[in-house]
Amino acid sequence: MKFTANSRIIAKNAVWSGVEVGFGLIANLFTSIAIARIIGRDDLGKARLGSYQYIVWLTTITLSMGTFGLPATTRKYMAEYLNKGNPEVARATYLSTLKLQTYISLIAAAIGFAVIAWLGDPGYLTASVLLVAAIVPRLIASIPSQANNASEAVRRNAAPAVAGVAVTAIVTGVSLYFGWEFVGLSLAAFLGAALECALKLRTVEKWLGHVRRGVVAPELRKRMWTYSGQSIALVLLALIVWDRSDILILKAMNPDTRQITFFSFPFSLVERVLMIPTLFGGALGFTMMAQYGRGEARLKDMTVDGGRYALMISLPLLVGMACISRPLVVLMYSASYRMMIPTLTLIALLAIPKALVTAPTMLLQTTERQGFLIFWGCVCGVVDIGLDFLLVGRHGANGAAIANGTAQGLAALGIWIYAWRADRLDLKLLDCGRIVISGAIMAAGVIAITRMAPGYLGLVLAVLGGAALWLVSLRLTAALKREDVDRFLSIGNQLPAAARPHWRNLIAWLAPSVSAS
């Protein structure tokens, strides 16, 4: 069976991204549970965790702004020129953006230190300094990371990322054991970021260091500055619409500091789970930008297929998480976090549109049509802030979840409609409907299991039963098409040799009519 080159590349990158994301998801889940149980074991601890989460979020604002401007530009134009057979210009682009990003990171850290000295809480001084210091390696690492993505070789990022997460998790565990609390957590973040940065810089030097540095032409430089500026505008809007900016209003309007913890923990957990469908969207995006350098003919089909696969991956994960939110919170975080149950349910369900928006966003960014994204982001940002003011004061974390999720849904709907009308996309809604029906069948089964079997056994049975029901539902609804079978088999070719026959049998079972023909 023949596979297209794009399918093979996307499959390979998705597998390597899966390694990175899977390791990070497991490490984050266990460390967050440990932090919640040890530091947040009483109401005072939960309040202190809320204050620390607020500081963490403030540092991520700078980090987010820095990781979407120049890094996005690096990925876009390196991919374009690498696939035009001009690696010299790609190297010049990389070195120019790396130098500028280094300056930006040092300036951002200096400003952060000044703010700490002026307005910082003395009780969190050392922790705040370490969190701000971690901005430098994180910002710098985003450039080699996107350079590797531009080359469509995500494997080069996997090992550094896993090493960084491992160091962060180990130091976090040691810190909790010795009672270093927030200083230890911040130290873990800094050490993990520093190691990941150093390793990623080394990987790029290995494959690009021998290339002669070219020249960035004035016309290209102008395009880069325009694209970078639009990317920064997009990330500012993303902080409002897609990130947890609701924390600001939550802190200002709700006197219960615990609500920040009840919002931050579920949000972080869902964000980690969202990385699973996003890893496929990311792999698709890298190939879309490379495809733009090779020719634009395939971009429309790649966009629609990317959205459908994101739905196929995200629906069971997010709906399943919402269905098991009660036993998950009570058993993993302890009964004292019961107030977090409805928040986790809301955030998980309302995050589904966020999982679907990567493909059309990448289409508009690849073709340098970010103007609508900026306009629509402004509209949705106003909606988010307005709903926050209406809901957060009275409903706390649940109000923030509703406001954030509603804005995300509106943003995703608008972006898909714009891409559909502007590019005349065939959205394949009937195929998407089959996936939604499969999700409904799975949800009904998982809810029934959690009600019949309480405790840890019920949680395990719900997860296993949900996975089985999802696969059975996909078979019953004939959700997989011929091209899906080809692509999933291509993914299977990246698995260890011993696992490949089992993968092929699973795909054949999921789509019997396609396999038979």
Placement of each model-derived feature along the sequence:
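N-terminal membrane topogenesis motif
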Residues: 1-30, 86-88, 95, 123-124, ...
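Interhelical loop/hinge segments that connect adjacent transmembrane helices in multipass membrane
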Residues: 1-10, 182-183, 198-243, 287-301, ...
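Signature of the first transmembrane helix
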Residues: 6-72, 109, 113, 134, ...
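Transmembrane helical elements of multi-pass membrane transporters/channels
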Residues: 12-32, 164, 188-200, 204, ...
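Transmembrane alpha-helical segments of multi-pass transport proteins
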Residues: 26, 30, 178, 239, ...
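Membrane-interface helix-loop junctions in multi-pass transport and translocation proteins
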Residues: 36-46, 125-126, 151-155, 165-198, ...
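Helix-loop junctions and terminal segments of transmembrane helices
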Residues: 67-83, 150, 208-209, 266, ...
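Hydrophobic transmembrane helix module of multi-pass membrane transport proteins
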Residues: 99-244
